[in-house]
Amino acid sequence: SIKVCGLCHGHYGYRNIARTIGLDPDGITWQAPGLNHNIWLTHFYYEGQDAYPLLDAWIKDNIEAYWEDRKSGDIPAQMSPSAIHQYKMYGLMPVGDTPRRGGWWYHTDLETRKRWYGGAIGGGDTPEGRDRVLKSKEERFQQMKEAAYDSEIRPIDLFGDRKTTEQHIPIMDGLVNDNEGQFQVNVRNDGALPGIPDDVAVEVPAIVNKKGIQPLRVYPLPRKIMLECIYPDWLQMERTLEALKSGDKSMLLYGILDSHQTRSYDQATEVLEALLAMEPNEPMAYVEDINKHYKWPSNW
């Protein structure tokens, strides 16, 4: 009975693609359905014309120079070697966080990450990259506290007066004030994305107004993307959920064994026990003890 809508701003990667190849993002018509952090640019039009040929021509003529110019700095994940490689593998551009998700072969070590995500540090998911992200978030958090508690500081001076592209407030505005708009949302599937069960959360476009959040039914994703990207993520989610609901400790172990970072069964058991031995942080300290919830099967 709880009304829930998940949001992610990764879909704005289509604007990064457009700007990079010299197109005005405001002239783009697009669609990128899938699962959270696993969405694919099925529709990419510029002023009514298919923009994929423009992207192909730009990649052919410019991508190597684009990467070379940024080898000592940062390459946006959206236009990284990983993203372009996935485009070549699947025939559709991965959007937003999808290039970061990729396959295990993009993430085996730091040098591999530098190959696929470029720049001086190999993207934002390396130790140095994460430190940058966390530092930025901490700085913004401190700004928010100052704006909230310091009467001498005006939020508008810190954050500006221009409307951002984030969807939270416009969606609320649509639901409450009937200012209709189309948004990218994560909701129960209920037939919106073909091939996925109704009770699984999918990321699709939706019309939002006083009547609620109404997902649009999208075209099926290519079968290869479904088999190699969508279904594996869906099944991993189902295994994780079943482990939580059943309390089966062996299912947690399987999740570690299934990782390409795992090198042996014994290593997997050591990792599991180390994770379960960690002190819980807030608010997990107030829920059920994880070691009481998860048990080995009775015949273990």
Model-derived segments and their meaning:
Residues S1-H11, W30-A32:
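Short, acidic/small-residue loops that bind anionic groups at enzyme active sites
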Residues Y14, T20-W300:
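Long, compositionally biased stretches enriched for glycine and/or charged residues
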